[in-house]
Swiss-Prot record:
UniProt xrefs under InterPro entries: GINS_A, GINS_bundle-like_dom_sf, GINS_Psf2, PSF2_N
CDD domains assigned to the protein according to its UniProt record, in alphabetical order: GINS_A_psf2, GINS_B_Psf2
Described purpose of this protein according to its UniProt entry: The GINS complex plays an essential role in the initiation of DNA replication. Has a role in chromosome segregation.
Keyword field: Chromosome partition, DNA replication, Nucleus
Localisation per UniProt entry: Nucleus
Upper taxonomic lineage: Eukaryota, Fungi, Dikarya, Basidiomycota, Agaricomycotina
PANTHER family xref list: DNA REPLICATION COMPLEX GINS PROTEIN PSF2
Description of how the protein assembles with itself and partners: Component of the GINS complex which is a heterotetramer of SLD5, PSF1, PSF2 and PSF3.
Source organism of this protein record: Cryptococcus neoformans var. neoformans serotype D (strain JEC21 / ATCC MYA-565) (Filobasidiella neoformans)
UniProt-recorded name of the protein: DNA replication complex GINS protein PSF2
Domain of life assignment: Eukaryota
Main location class: nucleus
Sequence similarity: Belongs to the GINS2/PSF2 family.
Any Gene Ontology biological process: double-strand break repair via break-induced replication
Record Gene3D superfamilies: 1.20.58.1020, 3.40.5.50
Length: 190
């Protein structure tokens, strides 16, 4: 492979954002057009003010050309993000389930279509708070007895972005823990 070894274990955040752009969103077109056939599918018809479902990449492209207004996902509202944050803080044992590609889609929409979102500054702040709470849980999980004694870390409900950030560290740490394990324990397992 042409990539350096440091990039083999995980995808980059940009690659994850690229993958997220294949998820579908709703747009309100500002133009009229019949169906359009693309490699990824057939989209349309586009008639304002009716909403249409398109891949995120197409919605972003139309938004940059001022041809549509992006309808934010239902979870990208101040009320829902506050609920996610509250639930995340209350659940000290694990991670709350977040929508698929939560961080990647949020970032792209806030960067490109912030004028289509209500209270984008508040949304950024809430997303940052959610991310910080989850990162604190990851740090606490890495220091827990389960990791030190049983060689595992529960990562249920982590987002792909969080897993990619954590994976290189975990691979090195687990390898180091295996070398520190006493020899008699290794023989018992075989």
């Amino acid at each position: 492979m042409a990539l350096p070894k440091t990039l083999h274990p995980a995808l980059t955040p940009d690659e994850l954002a690229f993958l997220a752009e294949h998820d579908h969103i709703s747009i309100v077109p500002l133009f009229s057009m019949t169906r359009v056939r693309l490699i990824s599918g057939i989209y349309g018809p586009f008639r304002p003010p009716s909403a249409s479902r398109v891949p995120l990449w197409l919605g972003l492209s139309l938004k940059k050309k001022r041809k549509c207004r992006i309808v934010p996902p239902e979870w990208l509202s101040a009320e829902r993000l506050q609920a996610f944050l509250r639930d995340e803080k209350e659940n000290s044992e694990g991670f709350e389930r977040l929508p698929r590609r939560f961080m990647e889609i949020s970032k792209v929409l806030l960067d490109i279509a912030s004028d289509d979102l209500s209270q984008p500054t508040l949304l950024r702040s809430l997303l940052k708070d959610i991310r910080e709470v989850r990162q604190a849980k990851i740090r606490m999980g890495l220091q827990s007895e389960d990791v030190l004694q049983n060689d595992y870390l529960q990562v249920t409900n982590l987002t792909p972005l969080e897993l990619c950030e954590l994976k290189p560290f975990l691979v090195r740490a687990m390898g180091l823990m295996q070398t520190l394990r006493p020899p008699e324990e290794e023989e018992d397992e075989e």
